[in-house]
Amino acid sequence: WNLLKRYTKRKDLVVDPMCGSGTTIDVARDLERRALGYDLAPSRKDIFRADARKIPLEDEKADFVFVDPPYSDHIRYSGKPECIGELSAEGDAYYLAMEQVISEINRILRPGRYMALYVSDSWEKGKPFMPIGFYLLQMLSQHFGIVDIIAVIRHNGKLMRNHWHTAAVEHNYYLRGFNYLFIMYKPAAGERVPQDRREADEIAEEIEARAVHKDG
């Protein structure tokens, strides 16, 4: 919600190439944005079947792209062998696939527009720590300018359980209670600073809402 309010306007085209359950397109439509969702295994009729490495959209058509890619091999995704979620984040194949996804995002995104990627690092007992976020940020930086890096706290009740903390001490690791949100910008020709794309009335509405909340 905050991303679309800050970086898009009404009737902008929002694209999610790894759409999952469709949250992105639902939020976009609620905010009067147009939306396209793609997924290798669509969960709804309004999500189109497509591989994020080959998005069926013309060049420079999207006004905003959000992507929440798979980022470890301890979660079962579609079960399809071609699914990026079936690739181990320990291997080169995963990062090659994500390079293709990021290149496609760059292709479909209009100049002077924003995109965001939501991801976490990964650690499993008996396996090396995988700084997936850092690797993907490096890839993103080949195409886009960095606008902001947000640490999004995961409100996961499991992390509060005592046995998780005991295990962390025993095996000498930290509990990872956050994801990265990388906000990136594709500059138009001659641009050096990202443009503020917010609409004046939406800014005013948000300021008023916060003032009412504070006073209340």
Regions found by a protein language model. Give the residues of each.
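Class I S-adenosyl-L-methionine-dependent methyltransferase catalytic core
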Residues: 1-216
